[in-house]
Amino acid sequence: MSIKSDKWIRRMAQEHGMIEPFVERQVRGEGADRVISFGVSSYGYDVRCADEFKVFTNINSATVDPKNFDEKSFVDIKSDVCIIPPNSFALARTVEYFRIPRNVLTICLGKSTYARCGIIVNVTPLEPEWEGHVTLEFSNTTTLPAKIYANEGVAQMLFLESDEECEVSYKDRGGKYQGQRGVTLPRT
């Protein structure tokens, strides 16, 4: 597998709709305002977080069960910022909608700006022929509230191209998160 460059990412986004909306350069500021960078980088794409958040709460004293997840465990927030309570987490989604080629696996890594503040981003790999908005999980590992900014960079996608296509893709399997839009909770 080889990692793909900015030229390949740009071509796949523009000719095949791999990333929509697509920002073909790295944005570090908007006017006089500084932002956490997003858009194409040398060997990746820095995604933005949309303004839809689900913040974990324990007001119902529920047990977290991935096979029977209770939606009431979250408070929905639509805002330019999200405050995550200490030692808690929030879900969000990317602004970008992805269409992953059949011979590509995409890995997501958190941005150092957030990591250096104790905020960890977790996303499982985007499998061959998966498409949708990426659901992002932000863990606040600190003892203080932590802030996430909507419409700014939160993570980087790395695209790894295989030397041969897989026999069965995510789409072929009928993956349960295929075509997801918005913030998507656990499914079984």
Curated annotation (Swiss-Prot):
Catalytic activity: dCTP + H2O + H(+) = dUTP + NH4(+)
Superkingdom of this protein's organism: Bacteria
Annotated catalytic residues: E137 (proton donor/acceptor)
Record field: transmembrane: none
Gene Ontology terms for molecular function: dCTP deaminase activity; nucleotide binding
InterPro entries recorded: dCTP_deaminase, dUTPase-like_sf, dUTPase_trimeric
Keyword Hydrolase among record annotations: yes
Keyword Transferase: no
GO biological process: dUMP biosynthetic process; dUTP biosynthetic process; nucleobase-containing small molecule interconversion
Binding site for dCTP: K111, S112, T113, Y114, A115, R116, T135, L136, E137, Q156, Y170, Q180
EC top class, as a word: hydrolase
Keywords assigned: Hydrolase, Nucleotide metabolism, Nucleotide-binding
Enzyme Commission number: 3.5.4.13
Binding partners and assembly: Homotrimer.
Biological role: Catalyzes the deamination of dCTP to dUTP.
Protein's recorded name: dCTP deaminase
UniProt source species: Pseudomonas savastanoi pv. phaseolicola (strain 1448A / Race 6)
